[in-house]
Amino acid sequence: MIHKLTSEERATQIAALHGWQAATGRDAIQRQFKFADFNEAFGFMTRVAIKAQEMDHHPEWFNVYDKVEITLSTHEANGVTERDIRLAAFIDSITA
């Protein structure tokens, strides 16, 4: 069984990430990204997709031209877990 983070654990973990925040109205974290153009945004999404597939943990995302919004939540746990934090940390590492 996957352990859903408590609100205290989630707050501590989010604080260690860059730009992530609690999603409104659900137990998830999200972040928005802006790139130079669509090619850069799509390249970023491709790198995230490869890592997500390796982790077997897939983001919810929305893309319009140079903007990407990512929401992370673990469906099996109905909330944020370490898997979300690990994927968010990876995403931070490729956007630093």
From Swiss-Prot:
EC numbers, comma separated: 4.2.1.96
Protein name: Putative pterin-4-alpha-carbinolamine dehydratase
GO MF annotation: an example: 4-alpha-hydroxytetrahydrobiopterin dehydratase activity
Keyword list, A-Z: Lyase
CDD domains xref list: PCD_DCoH_subfamily_b
Reaction(s) the record says it catalyses: (4aS,6R)-4a-hydroxy-L-erythro-5,6,7,8-tetrahydrobiopterin = (6R)-L-erythro-6,7-dihydrobiopterin + H2O
Provenance organism: Paraburkholderia xenovorans (strain LB400)
GO biological process: tetrahydrobiopterin biosynthetic process
Family: Belongs to the pterin-4-alpha-carbinolamine dehydratase family.
Broad enzyme group: lyase
Keyword Hydrolase set for record: no
SUPFAM superfamilies per UniProt: PCD-like
Keyword hit for Cell membrane: no
Classification via Gene3D superfamilies: Transcriptional coactivator/pterin dehydratase (3.30.1360.20)
InterPro entries for this protein: PCD_sf, Pterin_deHydtase
Pfam families the UniProt entry points to: Pterin_4a (PF01329)
